[in-house]
Amino acid sequence: MKTQRDGPSLGRWSLVLLLLGLTMPLAVTGRILSYQEAVLHAVDGLNQRSLDANLYRLLNLDPRPTMDGDPDTPKPVSFTVKETVCPRTIQRSPEECDFKEDGLVKWCVGTVTLNQAKDSFDISCDKDKRNVARLGDILQKAREKIEGGLKKLVQKIKDFFGKFAPRTES
């Protein structure tokens, strides 16, 4: 006849089940990403969904807003990406690619979660409005210089033709 001593005791099985139960949530939860890692993950997702010919790479990450500690809660993000020289069809990390000279810059906003198991982001990107504003400033300065140059040119033309005008002596 077998006794309890011959087989594993109920206490040992309880301990094994307890340890399994403690490790299961860790496997389901996954790794917690840093704010920057979550944004880089979102950039990878944007590249996968993009119809553009080249990959985009993170150019600038706006400062991290104050956030709660829950990695499952979506966190607001704002960043810019710039077009690289690498075609989207190659299997390469965007961080390995150089930025394309005069490449398209996009301003992106949305949310990311830091829990990698959730793998959640909701990002939308537009052409960088800040670059458009800078272009407007450049065009304004160019217009002012052209206007100033034209005024000087008109005055020189008047002075030149003024020399040939008949003079009346009084």
Curated annotation (Swiss-Prot):
One of its GO terms (biological process) is defense response to Gram-negative bacterium. One of its GO terms (molecular function) is lipopolysaccharide binding. One of its GO terms (cellular component) is vesicle. Keywords: Antibiotic, Antimicrobial, Disulfide bond, Immunity, Innate immunity, Secreted, Signal. Gene3D superfamilies: 3.10.450.10. Residues 1-30 form the signal peptide. It comes from the Eukaryota. Residues 31-131 form a propeptide. It is found in: Secreted; Vesicle. Proteolytically cleaved by proteinase PRTN3 into antibacterial peptide LL-37. Proteolytically cleaved by cathepsin CTSG and neutrophil elastase ELANE. PROSITE patterns: CATHELICIDINS_2. The keyword Signal applies. Disulfide bonds join 86-97, 108-125. Residues 150-162 are annotated as: Active core. Antimicrobial protein that is an integral component of the innate immune system. Binds to bacterial lipopolysaccharides (LPS). Acts via neutrophil N-formyl peptide receptors to enhance the release of CXCL2. Postsecretory processing generates multiple cathelicidin antimicrobial peptides with various lengths which act as a topical antimicrobial defense in sweat on skin. The unprocessed precursor form, cathelicidin antimicrobial peptide, inhibits the growth of Gram-negative E.coli and E.aerogenes with efficiencies comparable to that of the mature peptide LL-37 (in vitro). Belongs to the cathelicidin family. The cathelin-like domain (CLD), which is the propeptide part, does not seem to exhibit auto-inhibitory function, as it does not inhibit the antibacterial activity of antibacterial peptide LL-37. This is Cathelicidin antimicrobial peptide. It comes from Callithrix jacchus. The gene is CAMP.
